């Protein structure tokens, strides 16, 4: 159980790009980063409005001279300081992620980037290569993967409790945008605007979350090919989709399906991952994230609860409070930020033995998600043809 002790001997000097006073996601990043006392927020370019960003930064306790007007100035000035930042979080609109992450790596910084990492697999591959060249990590915030029960599922599958995996069923299908809410809500408009959102809406914004959760649970599975059909039920959103179906074939013979939607009227998140093996199945639902359903053929279904001593050591390592108490998304994000900090520390110490088996959503995961969306769009726009899935 985590008890507030730092996993590192010191706090990392941390900065932010984006995440200002009007940013919901920026608050989530700060809550996660500061939970375990392994980051200290020292600098930032927090807002496109420099004065507004400076005022907000001062409210957060950042000294005025380290509240910068833009990310270029942030990286340049901090590089000149003996106490300059060593890691930066990128919490800006999608269309800026590539340029900012690239500039941060070139400035010698570790990066924690909101997903998507960028818009194209070519850009993502460039960031993978640059990360290796600079010997800096890039963490990608697939926040739901930080829940304790995801690690429990991963261990159960690794231990063979499900047997050979046959089926992976994934969905993230909410109903909050079943009407053209973006016409009144500016905060939603960017999600359906290609310039800002990229080549897709729900495939990139929603589906990549359960996709990564499933891949965290069963990392041995590799997609071989896929087929996608996407729709714009609110016509003004075209060419971006607000609903999509994806079929996948894996290299071990397993099959997968994804339903992602913003027009599933009446639904909340409805994000679920079900993995079916030859002996048993598991299912996780993000609206009940502290539970994992374990179903063995011919036996009553078992609901595993977070915080209980029967869980695997890997799952209990992310435990923050005793069983029976709920943990939520901020705790899941904090688990990831803790892992990013450990990866940064190990990278700086060149501790390759630690990093070899250490899991966190890394730059390769970012590449995988970007390429998956790219291939889904390619398939859908070609009349839902099957397309190969070979990472560039």
Regions found by a protein language model. Name each.
Residues 204-291:
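Glycine-rich, aromatic-lined ligand/substrate-binding cores of catalytic
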Residues 1-2, 11, 143, 191, ...:
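C-terminal glycine/acidic-rich active-site capping loop/insertion
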Residues 87, 93-145, 160:
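Beta-strand-loop-alpha-helix segment that lines the small-molecule cofactor/substrate pocket
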Residues 66-85:
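A structured beta-alpha segment of the ubiquitous adenosine-cofactor-binding alpha/beta core
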Residues 39-42, 347-367, 387:
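Glycine- and charged-residue-rich phosphate/anionic-cofactor binding loop of Rossmann-like
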Residues 4-11, 136, 163-167, 378-392:
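C-terminal capping/lid region of NAD(P)-dependent oxidoreductase domains
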Residues 1-62:
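N-terminal Rossmann-like dinucleotide-binding module
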Residues 137, 144-238, 292:
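Predominantly a Rossmann-like dinucleotide-binding segment in NAD(P)-dependent oxidoreductases
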